Amino acid sequence: MASFEIKGGHRLHGEITPQGAKNEALQVICAVLLTNEKVVIENVPDIRDVNKLIELLMLIGVKVKCTYQDENERTFEFQADQVNMEALRSPEFATQATALRGSIMLVGPLLSRFGWAIVPQPGGDKIGRRRLDTHFIGMEQMGAKVTYHYSRYEVSALSEDGTSKHKNLKGTYLLLDEASVTGTANLIMAATMAEGETTIMNAACEPYVYQLCHMLNHMGAQIRGLGSNLLHIHGVRKLRGCNHRLLPDMIEVGSFIGMAAMTQSDITIKNVQVEHLGLIPQVFRRLGIEVWQQGDDLFIPAQEHYKIERFMDGSIMHIADAPWPGFTPDLISIALVAAIQAKGSVLIHQKMFESRLFFVDKLIDMGAQIILCDPHRATVIGLDHEHALRGVRMTSPDIRAGVALLIAALSANGVSRIDNIEQIDRGYQHIDERLRALGADIRRIE
């Protein structure tokens, strides 16, 4: 198990470019299964979760070719013209798919194109209960039969003669009980080649979902309502290949903003596509962090101090996650850690997952003033850089908490060690190398 050793207290300086969006990559890579033609995807991040998904596709017979545009940008060519559906039943597929929560999004495209799919109960971050009902209830409403036994889901829309030529997948009206991003993506892909029109109400409208719909339309799908929570998908008989480029990862953008503030550093975040960042810059500005837009770049100047705003009636600032266009839950951990060295107090409310704030005990060990109110809420009393955090040894519990701990370690006095950094590698590309280029003292210990 690898670790990071970080000597904190160094101010950082320079430019950094966010990787391709992880959450978008997982969706659009699954979508290559919808066609037998070549699909080219640019700006694919070199991270564990994405690489595991690509390995899963190769395991079921998808042809994959990778080229490097430069040392940090990859382009992949996929062709799913010889998919081996029986490989879904193999122990190897079950083992690999279980380790990746994104594997659930294989179901939608396989169901749409081949009429059936099998996937094990997926894993992923241990951040609380993350149910899959939204996915499977929607598929059942479209005519599929879903069974769960021996820790795997079997979904079939085949007619009784068992041939994919007689699929019973029908367009229908779907009112989702939650605006699930992966659930929305799965149902969109399932609906692209269903018979008739599917309407999805309360659809997730994150930029990732917009990008997926945009790509599918280039492939020949007929999707209306892109970017809204009401989607109309008219099923087509066949989809074609296309070229698609991933957005910059907005979670990395937010992480770098928090890192710059905590380490009192000046950093330019390049090519962020500001129009897709939503409330992210605004929320960090509420913490007192200066975020300047320069064209399509964000510049975070070095600040000796930054002060958390209060609401207009004088009450304590409250930052909570919400479905898009609200503040993304993936940045709640970063907002929390950025508040540690601010002046003032803030209530952080993680509404969507009940275990994502449990990492704060490690920050308290480092000297942070945090009160964990309950599994969903924590109050941060800022230190205003009057006291530095101290280096400690800790373990990364999940992707986002791991990076929050890394940011804290970069700002701390002394040496910190973070174990289980495979969690960080799941979502952040070559993060140690990129931080060293900014002046961080960080090394990987295998």
Predicted features along the sequence, with ranges:
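Short, structured segments at the rim of ligand-binding sites
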Residues: 1-446
